[in-house]
Amino acid sequence: MTAFSAHKSQDETAAIRNVETGLQEAWNHHDAKAFASFFTEDADCVNVVGWWWKGRPQIESKVADSHVFMFRDSTYTNDEVHIRLLTAQIAVVHVRWSMVGHQNPDGAPGQPRKGIQTHILQEQEGKWLIAAFNNTNSVPEVSFPTGARKNG
């Protein structure tokens, strides 16, 4: 890797990290328009329950709807961000996140949550944007059961 490409890589990583920070800030300000602005116009977003939203307008609308009640008092935190540049214009990002302050659909306070997101980012005209977003809740990892082996 040349000094130039190493420097460019550091610049790109910093720019991508700014996207992740901006996404967190937009969520915590309950600003769906700002949240959606970090996505490409034709982005795909799959939320923690598997709902698939297509395109920036739908992402903005669904995030706005979710913040009317369930997430209006939520605080979302990027606990760990791992960035991997695949090419000069494509990156994959894994975000370990946590959330407090949300409500369950029945109105009861939600328990603190943790999860992992996978983002595919694409550089468009000098700006990094999320082209694909997949979110999942996580549970503590446990050992796989060994069980009895079957012969035969």
Kindly give the residue locations of the regions a language model identified.
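A beta-strand edge to alpha-helix "cap/lid" segment located at domain peripheries
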Residues: 2-37, 44-152
